[in-house]
A protein has these predicted regions:
Chain B
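Intrinsically disordered/low-complexity terminal segments and short unstructured peptides
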Residues: 1-2, 7, 25, 46, ...
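Sec/Tat signal peptide C-region and signal peptidase I cleavage site
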Residues: 31-33
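A generic secondary-structure boundary signal that marks alpha-helix termini
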Residues: 24-25, 194
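N-terminal secretory signal peptides
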Residues: 1-14, 21, 28-29
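Enrichment for repetitive, rod-forming helical segments
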Residues: 19-20, 251
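Intrinsically disordered, low-complexity segments enriched in polar/charged small residues
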Residues: 17-18, 77
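Structured, non-membrane catalytic/scaffold regions adjacent to prosthetic-group chemistry
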Residues: 35-422
Length: 397, 422
């Protein structure tokens, strides 16, 4: 009796024995394949070609059907199938006007894109740029470059706001889309966009695209015997990278030297300097002892906050304020951040971020601070809240 | 700072200012002749004392002397570090396989951390039966193993207007080459039963960008894979754990990571990443769309600005990578004089379809200036063009698909720089 059969001899399920035995046999058979001249053909010329033959042999596996998986339920498909096409397929019923769009845009989008879609920092410019596509520096916006309005609707709906995707209502997406059209001068201020008139709106650059034609245009030109000898008379340098000098330098990429405001400097933190930063934090944390395990836990939870909030060395405001020193401070007190009026008023009344207020806020942000700009729905568990609070405390001492 | 020569990485500025350790090798050699090399004559601690026990690193990491071998980002390229990019250190690698931890990252909504037990893959749209698979279901389909390169369409995109970034990591590092283990997408589509009018698929990611791209059915049924392993182990988080799409030879953006859904439709969707982005604006203000295939390309990785020649004149190994989205690379030419004379390089290692190839050219460096270029030929007969040839067709606003020939100028000190030449 073979070793494998002995192993399975005690099994009560005869079928299982047969099945396993069959697989075991198949497995061995596969390992023997290379010795089979009929399958491999003539002896390959070199190890390399043997590798190719083995790697490109395909169609050997069974083609099914395998009866795997289960039927998707209509409500499951509805939850995930949110894509929109230029012909309007997938567009849900709804409506929104320019006026409402401006309100939502200023609250949800302007922090990165600017109040008028002009773009803050290197965040995308959404408006203008008409007739610049042949310029030295083309400005590719929803107005000047995007071919279809459905693309705008679909993208805002699936991926915006950055860090809180798929949180906008359908009507809000209609409204933002209407506002973008208005800012691009394509509709009047009293325009309302809905599923009914959606297909009537065309974007100026719809005809600015055509199918890849490299095969006809470039490939014939680039498919020819190249020169190998005496191909040119002389060689001169016409351009050098050192002139621009924009390459990141190892020597200036360490955390110590990026002490000045590097804005969004998380890359430097990845650069192995993160351990230094952590060590510093631990040293500073001599006053009320922190639960470091909880801080670590909180760092993981903070991933949910990271898209909008920065904390630590060089943290700056993004969609949300930077959070250094937040614990123990009044609400709405970080300098140079535009808070909601409620948040500011609560701070002025002397309400301070403590474990208790933070817990209340993070459980249900919009009910604790009515009108808060933070669109994050809140953390589900008390454990997560405690952990992230401890993590924030580590940057507040 | 270690005294080991390999571990010493003088900064680029030091190199450019001429203060490189170019003579270090010669110095050590001279010392050795005088009094015997202390690396040999003195008892080394690692020879005398015991090393680490077996379980010091249950998941092994590279030697501490290799800590400079890492992905690097270019901060000014993107608005923030989440929807951003970093680059594979090509100049530190050899062979054809990219180690998993060095594969460049490009995320549009950050690298999602997904519990595989909570992950589902749905196939819906124009199919007989819309289906949902768990990871466990997927593991029961037949698998295949293939080595493919993945190149971002924007690789070398910063170089359209001229030499900009000094280092092949930055000019060419949006590429990696790994062995994928995955299920032929064809089998999953057949399981759901594609209706005759189903001509396109829309893969979608589960991340915060919910990445989508339209892919023609012909490609989907041809060689696409739904992959869960890279180089034998689970996909890395940043490469789409637990499951990603593999679209061999086509631009990296289409290889949707954290794949959660595939819809079958009768027309393309024209979503953001195939209209606003990943379209190639030409000089006349019109743009090419659906430029999926990656043209044949190559780059010399050593020497290059981050890997100068530090050994002085004499025997020198030039090496680099070549690849094509249309097949294999039967031939690579290299020149050391800026293209007056070309030589056929030696390709070593497996030559696989839509995979990176490794080439070498050994020569005696006379200590004079070098103008290094490489030129890939692919199995369709296509020959990698010069940057100027590309500009003639496309202008300088394309951003994507820059596969022009790269030039490194190496001066008498062995310092290399990204340049363009006549």
């Amino acid at each position: 009796m073979s070793k494998s059969l002995k192993l399975y001899a005690g099994s009560a399920l005869g079928a299982a024995i047969i099945l396993t035995g069959a697989m075991n046999f198949a497995d061995r058979n596969i390992t023997q394949l290379p010795e089979n001249a009929a399958v491999m053909g003539a002896a390959p010329e070199s190890p390399d070609t043997m590798f190719i033959a083995a790697a490109t042999a395909s169609g050997a596996e069974a083609e099914g059907p395998f009866g795997l998986g289960r039927e998707a339920l209509p409500e499951e498909i509805a939850a995930w199938d949110i894509d929109i096409r230029p012909d309007g397929k997938g567009l849900p019923e709804g409506r929104g006007n320019v006026w409402d769009g401006e309100g939502v845009f200023v609250e949800q989008c302007a922090v990165c894109h600017g109040d008028f879609g002009e773009g803050v920092g290197r965040w995308p410019v959404l408006t203008g740029g008409f007739d610049t596509l042949t310029d030295q520096r083309p400005v590719k916006t929803t107005g000047s470059y995007w071919p279809y309005l459905s693309t705008v609707w679909d993208y805002v709906h699936r991926a915006m706001p950055f860090g809180n995707a798929q949180s906008l209502t359908d009507d809000e997406v209609y409204a933002i889309t209407a506002y973008l059209l208005n800012m691009n001068g394509l509709v009047d201020g009293d325009f309302e966009l809905s599923h009914e008139n959606f297909s009537e709106v065309t974007l100026p650059n719809e005809d600015g695209f055509y199918m890849d034609d490299r095969e006809e245009l470039e490939l014939p030109e680039f498919t020819r015997d190249p020169c190998m000898e005496n191909c040119k008379e002389s060689v001169e340098i016409t351009m050098r990278a050192a002139v621009l000098d924009v390459t990141p330098d190892e020597a200036v990429q360490t955390m110590e030297e990026s002490g000045e405001d590097h804005g969004t400097d998380m890359a430097a933190a990845d650069d192995g300097a993160a351990t230094e930063a952590e060590a510093d934090t631990a040293e500073d944390a001599e006053t009320p002892a922190l639960d470091m395990a909880l801080v670590d836990e909180g760092e993981k939870v903070f991933r949910k906050c990271k898209a909008c909030h920065q904390v630590g060395d060089g943290a700056s405001h993004r969609v949300g304020p930077q959070l250094n020193g937040v614990m123990g401070r009044e609400l709405g007190a970080a300098e140079d951040f535009r808070y909601s009026s409620t948040m500011e008023e609560m701070g002025e009344e002397g309400i301070v971020w403590t474990e208790e207020t933070m817990a209340e806020f993070l459980a249900k942000p919009r009910s604790y601070v009515k009108g808060t700009k933070m669109s994050f729905p809140g953390l589900r568990s008390d454990e997560e809240i405690a952990a992230v609070t401890e993590y924030l405390k580590s940057f507040s001492q | 700072m270690t005294t080991s020569f390999k571990g010493t990485k003088p900064s680029r500025r030091q190199f450019l200012s001429g203060a490189a350790a170019a003579g270090a090798g010669t110095f050590v050699a001279a010392q050795a002749r005088a009094a015997g090399d202390p690396a040999i004559t003195e008892l080394q601690p690692w020879t005398q004392q015991l090393g680490d026990g077996v379980d010091v690193a249950p998941y092994g990491m590279p030697s501490e002397y290799e800590s400079h071998v890492k992905r690097r980002t270019v901060e000014w390229l993107t608005a923030d570090p989440i929807s951003s990019i970093n680059f594979t250190p090509l100049h530190e690698l050899d062979g054809i396989i990219t180690p998993n931890g060095l594969c460049f990252e490009r995320h549009h909504g950050g690298a999602a951390h997904i519990d595989p037990a909570e992950h589902r893959l749905m196939i819906n749209g124009l199919v007989e039966t819309p289906l949902v698979f768990t990871m466990q279901d997927l593991m029961r389909f037949p698998r295949e193993n293939h080595v493919y390169f993945l190149e971002c369409a924007a690789n070398s995109g910063m170089e359209w207007r001229g030499s900009q970034l000094n280092g092949c990591q930055f000019t060419h590092g949006m590429i990696h080459n790994v062995m994928y283990t995955g299920i032929p997408l064809r089998l999953l589509l057949q399981e759901a039963g594609v209706k005759t009018e189903g001509k396109w698929i829309l893969p979608e990611g589960a991340d915060a960008a919910a990445m989508t791209r339209s892919i023609p059915m012909e490609k989907a049924l041809d060689d696409c894979l739904v992959a869960f392993k890279m180089n034998g182990e689970a996909l890395r988080t940043e490469q789409g754990y637990p499951v990603r799409l593999v679209v061999p030879g086509w631009e990296g953006n289409m290889w949707v990571k954290w794949l959660r859904r595939i819809e079958v439709g009768d027309k393309p969707w024209h979503h953001r990443e195939e209209t606003s982005k990943y379209t190639d604006l030409l000089a006349d203000g019109k743009a090419r769309r659906f430029t999926w295939e990656m043209d044949a390309k190559s780059v010399i990785t050593n020497p290059s600005p981050q890997a100068p020649l530090t050994h002085g004149k004499g025997p020198t190994v030039l090496t680099g990578m070549a690849w094509s989205g249309r097949g294999t690379i039967p031939r690579v030419d290299v020149t050391t004089d800026g293209g007056i004379t070309w030589h056929q390089a030696r390709i070593s290692g497996p030559s696989l379809d839509k995979s990176m190839h490794r080439f070498y050219y050994e020569f005696d460096w006379d200590g004079g200036p070098l103008y290094l270029q490489s030129r890939a030929h692919d199995s369709t007969g296509y020959v990698q063009p010069t940057k100027d040839q590309l500009r003639e067709f496309r202008g300088v606003n394309s951003i994507y698909h820059n596969n022009g020939i790269q030039t490194w100028y190496v001066n008498e000190e062995g310092i290399a720089e990204n340049v363009e030449i006549s």
